[in-house]
């Protein structure tokens, strides 16, 4: 078994490669993450990887006595009297994994737990229950084969597993986002929000519009879209420009880190085994509560501060006037504009609700109507199917609105997939890096935390993600790295609360310390006309406040409503 010092050193090398590669050598995040995954896998002994794989497949030991033990086999009919299991442990001196005993199934107790007879293997170092785990012979064979793969195959396996979970979703989200922008649907949503709340309450419309648009559209793109509208509002009202900027940021940035199918929260949910529908609901509630705190902060701040509307390189004030005066007839209807955003949310969350309602209910007690509804959501509530339907609707809307030919449509889709492809590469590379971190046995670093409070576990996840964000800038990369550190720990212990809270703590941690190493910092500053000092002075404290408040909400919810 690797010592804690050795594990820390290997993990530290990986983190240094990611942070140093991105900041020091200006490597693309994809290259930095893949390189880090390769180096960490090279430094991790095969025996450590094998032990990690065995740990994922171990059978819970409920009790043990001299010569016997009781196992939790979940009363599976596949287990028969006479079936053999293995007791394995890592030898302290060498780190190698050895089989120290066999366990033969001899019967079941009154609670249908398996009783096994223990027979030590001659010549082994002996059974030590606090260091040994029980596995099937097949699991031992599979773990050995997995650990003996080449480094290239190990990294590619982590990369491919991540692509399987989220690759299609990100590509479809990119298509939806591009169609919303090119068709004018995104602008229509913002104008509709403004018409509901009125120009006096324009900041609120910016919050909710930014939040809604940032689920299928990446934050930088949402800011590009909405800041001209914010500038146009400043031309109309003659005041509150700083408030407009900050409200555009707060809605978009919280959805960016908390609500799938945005890549960061989508990846975190997949790694922690959180249902996407649950993540959408929980992320939406926490994200909007954080945005409201950011709004209160901005209202107070803007009583004492404002900034002038300045010319910016990408758009003159005359062009702003043209945007402000654009006719509504040039834009799609509001229901068509909202459909690609709302439909997948309804389908995915509907599937989650049905699964929760019918969980544990015997089939004979479910009415035919409920069975039909359940089958509908099983098919159309699948995250990939729901997003594919939404992408189809978005494409149809773009074609109808622009009346473009197939070549123009192909160009739009090509641009969307090019953008989404880069995100898929970065996220999948992050998945490979995360898997390599987990295989070092990093969960052992948190051994003393297993019995710690809910608050302590969530704070650790938040702090780890925050420090990575501070070091390298990207919220998405910090979430990928943070969940890579925490996922194996979360899988190995009883958290005492639903893992969605761990995902939320990681997402909130990615909101801390916005500064000059983040591309979003420069997008906000340059597009709005703010100086670097103004961005640091006004925007950075707000995003950090929202992240910290999100952690507080998550801690309170996990303690009061653990959902387990």
Name each model-derived stretch.
Residues 5-9, 160-167, 193-207, 236-244, ...:
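Membrane-interfacial loop-to-helix junctions in multi-pass transporters
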Residues 74-77, 82-89, 133-187, 211, ...:
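Core transmembrane alpha-helical segments of multi-pass membrane transporters/permeases
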Residues 167-173, 196-229, 424-432, 453-489, ...:
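Hydrophobic alpha-helical transmembrane segments of multi-pass integral membrane proteins
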Residues 231-345, 520-557:
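Membrane-core helix-loop-helix motifs of multi-pass transport proteins
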